[in-house]
Design a protein with these regions (language model features):
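Hydrophobic alpha-helical segments typical of transmembrane helices
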Residues: 48, 86-89, 111, 173, ...
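Non-catalytic C-terminal accessory region of glycerolipid acyltransferases
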Residues: 4, 133-270
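Catalytic core of membrane glycerolipid acyltransferases/transacylases, capturing the structured
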Residues: 20-29, 41-42, 55, 70-129
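Short glycine/serine/threonine/alanine-rich loop segments
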Residues: 58, 121, 182-183
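A short beta-turn/loop motif at secondary-structure boundaries
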Residues: 66-70, 202-203
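A transmembrane-helix-recognition feature enriched in membrane-embedded lipid enzymes
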Residues: 1-61, 114-115
Length: 270
């Protein structure tokens, strides 16, 4: 029942803005993409994402955001995958335009189709090898284009529903794009997104922890086999999860015993 009222509150907060955004911004920018820069399309989308997350009382706690600010160039973002809103959280954090590679099946959803047009999502066909070759080239070109998007990939290939301290296997193919584009690779650890839309969890604030590790330069991984590099990144993210979960427990414990809004110095403020 609480979740039901939460959804009602969210709808009341953001539905008018969403409708206005869709009919007067999204459709216009999709139909005349050539008139709107990637940055403008992205920033409008990002603003709406932030409104939606705020409506759900999401609190994003970020560590290592300075690595994004200091990146200075395009990068490949590799993150573990624990919730359906993982991409939205990264969009909310990143002022720099970022798009994502996702499985083709998601393109059947109306919302995803619209987002694909807006921020140039790359949908991967896992069954067709020839299509995969074309899609890999698209991902490489996306990173190489100085005016284009950064690229986010979830190398586990699916959401990890086990929610333990170990990530699923990081597919070697996810890092090969970095080799081909000669791009810096940014390892990212995400935790807490699975609670936001779940019926099993009800919190006054939903903490989401995101940690950015130091980018890995092409010169530092060019001689490492892709499978080994993917495993190294997986181990680092798994290690981060152990520390993040301790912070998460503390946050939730404090939330249960305090009626006041909890603020952390490390909290990311929109």
């Amino acid at each position: 029942m609480r979740k039901f009222f939460t959804w009602l509150k969210v709808i009341a907060k953001v539905l008018p803005s969403l409708l206005h955004y869709y009919f007067f911004v999204v459709l216009k920018q999709i139909r005349h993409k050539e008139k709107y820069s990637i940055n403008l399309r992205y920033q409008n989308f990002r603003l709406m994402v932030i409104k939606i997350l705020n409506a759900f009382n999401v609190k994003i706690i970020v560590e290592g955001k300075n690595y994004l600010n200091e990146l200075g160039e395009k990068g490949l973002y590799l993150a573990n995958h624990v919730g359906g809103i993982d991409p939205l959280v990264l969009v909310a954090i990143s002022e720099k335009p970022i798009t994502f590679a996702a499985k083709k099946e998601l393109g059947n959803k109306i919302v995803i189709r619209e987002i694909k047009q807006l921020i140039d999502l790359i949908l991967l066909d896992r069954e067709n090898v020839m299509n995969q070759i074309h899609e890999i080239k698209t991902m490489v070109n996306t990173i190489k284009d100085p005016k284009g998007f950064n690229l986010g990939i979830f190398p586990e290939g699916t959401r990890n529903k086990q929610l333990d301290d170990k990530c699923l296997e990081f597919k070697a193919g996810s890092v090969k794009v970095g080799y081909m584009a000669k791009a810096k690779i940014v390892p990212i650890t995400i935790w807490g997104t699975f609670r936001v839309l779940s019926k099993k969890h009800y919190l006054k604030e939903y903490p989401i922890f995101v940690k950015f590790d130091e980018p890995i330069a092409p010169n530092d991984y060019s001689d490492i086999p892709s499978a080994e590099l993917a495993e190294n990144i997986r181990q680092q993210v798994s290690k981060n999860l152990i520390n993040i979960k301790e912070k998460d427990k503390l946050f939730i414990a404090n939330q249960k015993i305090s009626k006041k809004r909890i603020e952390y110095e490390t909290s990311y403020k929109y």
